[in-house]
Amino acid sequence: MLCFIGNTSLVTALGNECDTIHAIENNQSGLYYSEKYNAVVGEIPARAFDNITSKVNFTKFESLIIQNIKNVLPTENDIDDDTLLVISTTKGNVHLLENNTAVIDNNCFLYTSAIKIADYLKFKRKPIVISNACISGVSAFVVAKNLMSSDDTIKNVVVVGCDILSEFIVEGFRSFKSLSNKPCKPYDANRDGLSLGEACGAVLLTKDINLASKPLIALKGGAVTNDANHISGPSRTGDGLYYAMKEALNDAEVLGADVKYVNMHGTATLYNDEMESKAIQWSCLSNVPVNSFKGYIGHTLGASGVVETILCIYQMRNNIVFATKGFEKRGTPCKLNVSDANRLYTDVNICLKTASGFGGCNAAIVLVKNPVNAYNNAEKPNASIGGEDNIKVLAQYSLPNSSECFSDFIRKEYKQLNLSYMKFYKMSDLSKALFIASENIIRQCPEIVNANPRRVAIIMSNKVSSLEADIQHQQIVDKHLEEGASPAIFVYTLPNVAVGEVCIKNKIKGDNTFFIENFNTGLSEYYAKQLLRLNKADFVICGWCDKEIASEMPMDESQINANSDLEKMNGINKDNNWNVNLKILSK
């Protein structure tokens, strides 16, 4: 079964899809110094998107997604129930917290926005939301392909990625001292940091060759891995990304020697670009053309994987590899075939696209032009897909209920485990809750301890994402302190970092995907089973890790003070009302 690329649409700091491609072809950048952010950024020009917010109360984030989805839908008629919407984002409408952390706007909840969008466009299926740091967009393609491969009822998937600039994001990256004061220079000897951008991109994936754009390009392989090394820095060896690349190629049944082009994350930070060069060397791809788009449009976070894949698709269809803007002289320890000029080739028919992010996550996908047997894409019965397939529940665990405040309760739970792991005390509450639950369930399952770490996956979901850490970070940002924001807090403003902590402690290096939904529908367990059925894991830890919401309605100061001992604030009940339920599945 092949997943073909259908219509595509994007908007970046350079404009819409046509404008963006034309600018890149002509070596033009959309990055500029912004007085608002006191940083070099790439903002979407107002002319580049339809402002429908005034009509139906959509935010800029939601408007961009709606516009780009409309552009890729094959028909204006009703969307069939065989079409799924997958949204990737890191922070969604987090800008709504600015100077407003005493009230929690419902649109701060990622799935609330997703439902608004899906209902407005009349999708019949409930959307899927992925928040996996900077690999979110590439991860969304991996999830979409896996679901299309294992679920006969899904014929089409609209994959859309979007993130917009905000003080929240800019000050967070500034706290890590990772922003350049000039347009970024990926892979260059003089690179000194990244440039942030905003964007939205959408792609129609389809099993129907009649809906595929020509020449045909198929999403043939994909994989997600974890470094199990550090929550805010990449593996210094490049092994985590290498294994994502290797597994994506294996999934696509493509040899590394056949890859014609690699589009890397290429953020222009010292460690990221260094790590990527090592992963390229591990993969024996040092002579294959490589590029990064960050010098044109900036790092667009959860949108980057989708937007950059669309640019890869254009290059494949036109047999060109665009220049890496800002690159002059290679400054990576291992060889990379990077150029400051556009390069034409006879046939760019196989592309490997990668991404890496906080929490140690890595992802890669493989695109193939004019794949063999493209016109014989009938779905074949596969006994491994249907039924329960002897999938077993090896262990279950739920974090106990307690009337104690969470900080006291979780410390006692930690001490009962007789651990000596000082990192625990620096974690966010979300990370602590998942960490303790994971330690308990793994102790029930000795098989997982001795398993191949690359064959162990963690699939999680929740509603609030990382809202507590978001509020803490935003409150610091709102004060405009001379010392700036705290990197120790900002790093936890991504829900998948909680999974990353578990991966680091237990050396788990397989798939690590984090879904967002309004309540526990069993999505994480459903997807875990698909990974097992597709033979992409031997063991999967899956479940729900969330904090119950005391109120999603605005709360004034008197209401906050009235909550017991100030334990309820910002719309979130700070008592021990965590809901953490885990399972370990295996075949």
Task: Label the predicted regions.
Residues 1-127, 146, 166, 175-195, ...:
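Conserved "HGTGT" condensation-loop signature of ketosynthase/thiolase-family condensing enzymes
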Residues 130, 155-161, 540-544:
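A short, small-residue-rich loop immediately preceding and capping a beta-strand
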Residues 134:
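Short, thiol/selenol-centered motifs that function as redox-active sites or metal-ligating centers
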Residues 137:
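Short conserved active-site loop signatures built around small residues
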Residues 140-141, 204:
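Active-site alpha-helical elements of protease catalytic centers
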Residues 147, 151-156, 161, 535-536:
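Phosphate-binding/catalytic loop of phosphoryl-transfer enzymes
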Residues 169:
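Short beta-loop-alpha junction of Rossmann-like oxidoreductase domains
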